Every structure is written in C-alpha cells, then in structure tokens.
Design a protein with these regions (language model features):
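Solvent-exposed alpha-helices and their adjacent loops that cap or buttress functional pockets
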Residues: 7-9, 63-64
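N-terminal loops that bind phosphate or other acidic moieties
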Residues: 3-5, 11, 56
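Compact, glycine-rich, soluble single-domain proteins
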Residues: 16-57, 61-65
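Intrinsic disorder
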Residues: 2, 16, 55, 75-77
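C-terminal structural segments of small proteins and small subunits
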Residues: 65-97
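Intrinsic-disorder/low-complexity, polar/charged segments enriched in Ser/Thr/Lys/Arg/Asp/Glu/Gln
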Residues: 8-14, 69-71
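Long, contiguous binding/interaction regions
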Residues: 2-5, 33, 81-85
Length: 97
C-alpha cells in the first residue's frame, strides 16, 4: 500500500486486493456501501481504466483479482475520510476472511 497523495481536497491511494477471490459481487457491494457514506466523488483506476467507485458493476468490470493493484481517487468534503475507510475495508479483505 502506498502513501496517500493529496492535491487540495483530492486524495489518491494505491491499494492491493488482499482477499482470495478478488473484487467480485460481495466485495464490490461493500466497497460501494462504504463509498456512499461520504460526501465525496470516488473513482477507482486499474490498468488505465477509471470507473465510478460508487458503481458495483463498474468495480466488478475492473476484474481485480487477488494481488491486483488499483488506485482510489477521492475528492470533496469527506474525501480523506472516505479514502481512509475504503483503505481499511480493503486491508480487512472486504470482511470476507
């Protein structure tokens, strides 16, 4: 996991998928549920593709398997809090294991 990068009220963090099955339906739903708790625009970028972090389908389309690296970008009032909570969720393996 890399250090959080800031740009005004925008924050970015590279994370690694740690759970055994990657980001499938349940982890994507948990990610979106967490993201939706905050007043922030959240985008996820993997292999040059950038999707809305509040979209379950978008997250699943990234095909982020175990060990995959992806970057979360957050901007807005709660951007830093959102990014910290998302990082915690990923580190907890999406509460699956």
């Amino acid at each position: 996991m890399s250090a959080m990068k800031t740009d005004g009220q925008a924050f970015s963090k590279e994370l690694t998928v740690l759970n055994k099955q990657g980001i499938h339906a349940r982890p994507a739903a948990r990610f979106v549920k967490t993201a939706n708790q905050f007043a922030a625009d959240i985008f996820v970028e993997k292999d040059g593709e950038k999707i809305n972090g509040k979209s379950i389908i978008g997250l699943m389309m990234l095909a982020a398997g175990p060990g995959s690296k992806f970057t979360v970008h957050a901007s807005g009032t709660d951007a830093q809090k959102a990014l910290l909570e998302i990082e915690a969720l990923v580190k907890r393996k999406f509460d699956e294991e």
